[in-house]
Amino acid sequence: MKYDDTDILIDTSLLRKIEEKKHRLDSLRPLPKDAIKKLLEDFRLRHTYHSDAIEGNTLTLQETKFVLEQGMTIGGKPLKDHIEARNDAEAFDFMLQLVQKKMPFSQECIQQIHDIVTKGLLKDSGKYRTGNVRITGASITPPSYTKVISLMDDYIHTIKNPPRHPLKKATFIHHQLVLIHPFFDGNGRVARLVTNLFFMQQGYPPIVLKQQDRKTYYRVLHQADNGNLSPLAVFIAKAMNESLQLYLSVFIDEEHLISLKELAQRSPYSQEYLSLRARQGKLDAAKLEQTWYSSMRALKEYVKKMKLS
């Protein structure tokens, strides 16, 4: 299995933002355990909701929270949706255990993640597929089931090689697992968890790929299927930039996230203007559900760049 990240291009300004944030976060280590625990609880909820919603789960974020915290069912919602939410949250916890125990990547780990994700939903949970499949809407057909084990051997071997750049390696990890499609079902959910497993093993926070970006997500996966991994790499990099920003907002006052409405009141710019610049990627910002947030530090950096331009 060939892996060459020289063809994977990510905007240098975006990479610089991520590297600077990662450096600032690393300079704060060791991070307070209580704060990390709360952060990971939030990521666990949001990852579970969004990863399931991408696959068609009908639970809202608040309903997902209720199911996970109270263990009860939501009237009018399919039982399958409740099982998916509980399974994904449990798989996220298992992923954290693998990170804490410093377990190396292996086929067994990936199969265990799949077993948890599809528990009670798939009779072959945790087992590679024993037949050929087609993916609706995909431009390519997954390889023959007879090649899955050898392809997964190559996949694990490539992951274990030192990454030239974690973001580019994560792009390969995510796409290749979707491409091999080793299981009859649940491949997307497993790929998103395995990507986060890799990131956290490299000292990065987990990322959340959002359901409102579902069309973009499938489009960049389609482009990756056709040999262009750069759009997927940028998509993942933007998610990482946001995750790092969320982490820093907890530990540094100047990085504390506030809504653009509040930020506009502290600046000469309108909320509409700041929102536009956030969408354009000019103002470092994070979108949590339907609301944009940024920080005083990001605003100061934006103003500084504007003066220099």
Where are these regions (language model features)?
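FIC/Doc superfamily catalytic core
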Residues: 1-185, 189-309
